[in-house]
Amino acid sequence: MELYYLTAHELSDLLNRKEISSEEATAAIIDRIEAVDGRVQAYLTRTAEQALEEARAVDAARARGETLGPLAGVPMALKDNLCTEGVRTTCSSRMLADWVPPYDATVVRRLKEAGAVMLGKLNMDEFAMGSSTENSSFFPTRNPWDLERVPGGSSGGAVAAVAAGEAYFALGSDTGGSIRQPASFCGVVGMKPTYGRVSRYGLVAFASSLDQIGPITRDVTDCALVLEAIAGHDPLDSTSADLPVPDYRSALKPEVKGLKIGVPREYFGAGMEPEVAAIVRRAIAKLEELGAVCEETSLPHTEYALPAYYLVAPAEASSNLARYDGVSYGLRVPGKDIIEMYMNTRSQGFGPEVKRRIMLGTYALSSGYYDAYYLKALKVRTLIRRDFETAFEKYDLLATPTSPTVAFRLGEKAGDPLAMYLSDLCTIPINMAGLPALSLPCGFSQGLPVGLQLIGRPFAEATLLQAAYAFEQSTEYHRRRPELGVA
């Protein structure tokens, strides 16, 4: 297999045995980016020279016999809503097209401490609002498995980069499925940790009660490795949980015997492509074959998750995005007075989907409609959380499709926001409940990847990783790579 298609842990083993240098691995990835990113369009900002300098520094430290971090010398990339000191961070928006943060996000700092090498910043839907990466203000990213299809979103650039061999791993953010849905579309592993497991400090906020940062990797072992590096309490984020970080790699045993897995029938309803449903059911049967006990169950309020989410998330976005006014930082479009300057800046700085959600959120929070919409959505959110609590009294995990479909064609849903929102039908309830969930490849339909979603109890990421690892070790889907020849 080509060097750029190795997993992070495979590369790390080669580096530790000194069979290859970090500079060589980084140069190979930079060459790969040069060869294919003109078609995939995953990167917004490349930091090739900085990456090579960081790689040389790791090689020098290794030569001196210094103790190195678990990701030392491994090249990675970041979704462009994670603050990076001295490196442009745009959120794929005109509003922040030239913004350079003065500090690193906590997860970025932790990756640096672990020794990882940063290749650049990755395309996304503007302010993480979208399911296809077509809402980027710069350009759409393409799915490496079929360049006429979307990679999913909003972390489409991050997932496409990992799938295409343009980074060994990436970090994304997940507010309603933005790591898991594109991971399903592009055939990689994507995890949304429990809300509070990973610090949000330095993540440009979309919906603060739903956002969570997580790893995007080529296999489950890499997922465990990266999660362990970024997880843990952070005094700079009051919502981060003050709990010890487990040794996630020690949970990676190919053993699910006796594990009880619930299969919610509501996740196989209308809108589900029959072949996707069949592939996911075969994956669940494989877990059963490996010794898990799988039973059908019910999460009765699932059908209300999507409408409730599209009140809660836009309401929080309306508040969070009020800060972009042209005064302190970011885009400023002049006007005859400050009111006109605000209007010009926000109308020209935000794209159509962001404006749509700000309008919806502002409406839901307005005095005449707050009780009827926003407050009711919060009550529904409580019912959704209670459904999961009831299910987890009986089951260790839940298993569902990650997405009701395979990757759709570029432009296919761009003019139909409701059709686009339905892409996250299977992922949104997990964010509403604050639970951990993971998508991993479980098959192919029409030559396109399909994802299995595993959902766990709060802070039970180790159990998720164990079950995912057991499935992965008994199949070969995670070893398949898209055939992206060099143009």
From Swiss-Prot:
Keywords: ATP-binding, Ligase, Nucleotide-binding, Protein biosynthesis. Transmembrane segments: none annotated. Its EC number is 6.3.5.7. One of its GO terms (biological process) is translation. Belongs to the amidase family. GatA subfamily. This is Glutamyl-tRNA(Gln) amidotransferase subunit A. Pfam families: Amidase. Heterotrimer of A, B and C subunits. One of its GO terms (cellular component) is glutamyl-tRNA(Gln) amidotransferase complex. Coiled coil: none annotated. NCBIfam families: gatA (TIGR00132). It catalyses: L-glutamyl-tRNA(Gln) + L-glutamine + ATP + H2O = L-glutaminyl-tRNA(Gln) + L-glutamate + ADP + phosphate + H(+). It comes from the Bacteria. PANTHER family: GLUTAMYL-TRNA(GLN) AMIDOTRANSFERASE SUBUNIT A, TRANSAMIDASE. Allows the formation of correctly charged Gln-tRNA(Gln) through the transamidation of misacylated Glu-tRNA(Gln) in organisms which lack glutaminyl-tRNA synthetase. The reaction takes place in the presence of glutamine and ATP through an activated gamma-phospho-Glu-tRNA(Gln). The keyword DNA-binding does not apply. The active site is at K79 (charge relay system), S154 (charge relay system), S178 (acyl-ester intermediate). One of its GO terms (molecular function) is ATP binding. It comes from Moorella thermoacetica (strain ATCC 39073 / JCM 9320). InterPro entries: Amidase, Amidase_dom, AS_sf, GatA.
